[in-house]
Design a protein with these regions (language model features):
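Aliphatic-rich helix starts adjacent to a transmembrane/signal segment
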Residues: 4-48
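Low-complexity, Gly/Pro-rich coil/beta segments used as flexible assembly/activation regions
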Residues: 41-163
Length: 163
């Protein structure tokens, strides 16, 4: 083998090494992207589950057994009443202050925190209210050390009574 052939062989080996390194890097990056997508799907599922669960309950403790005809009948303190613990909540605002840790099989550990507030809805604007209103907003935050960001989900529940 002459000097030219040796040089060509070395260049071919370098190019092959670079190609293999590039393929491995892309495979690792794709694997990380797929893993992150799976974490986000799981986190979304956990967040929406809380919202769906809360939305299926009564609007307020005062509306569990009877109808509300004035905002003065609504609870001034949002959160679970004495003796109520998750998952045995009976109204929407019981979820206020909930912190839930979920470990999904073969996945990350997720922390879910919930805040419920009275809001005033006017057109497309939603403003937090310090006094009871016929609308409450739930904010669910799902985070994990395995994710680079926190997913935030919000929904508004309003009380409607028809005579």
């Amino acid at each position: 083998m002459g000097t030219g052939q040796t040089l060509l062989t070395i260049m071919a080996m370098l190019m092959l090494s670079r190609l293999i390194l590039s393929v491995n890097t892309n495979t690792a990056q794709n694997g990380a992207s797929i893993e992150m997508a799976a974490y986000r799907i799981t986190a979304s599922s956990l967040g929406f589950s809380i919202i769906e669960e809360a939305s299926g309950l009564a609007f307020d403790q005062a509306s569990v057994a009877s109808n509300i005809t004035a905002t003065s009948q609504l609870s001034t303190t949002l959160g679970p009443e004495t003796g109520e613990v998750y998952p045995n909540f009976n109204d929407f605002d019981d979820f206020n202050g909930l912190v839930k840790i979920d470990t999904v099989a073969n996945s990350a550990v997720f922390k879910t925190t919930v805040v419920v507030q009275y809001v005033t809805v006017s057109g497309s604007s939603i403003v937090v209210s310090s006094t009871p209103t016929y609308s409450k907003q739930i904010t669910v935050k799902v985070s994990s050390v395995s994710m680079s960001d926190t997913l935030i989900f919000q929904d508004v529940m309003s009380y409607w009574y028809f005579r």
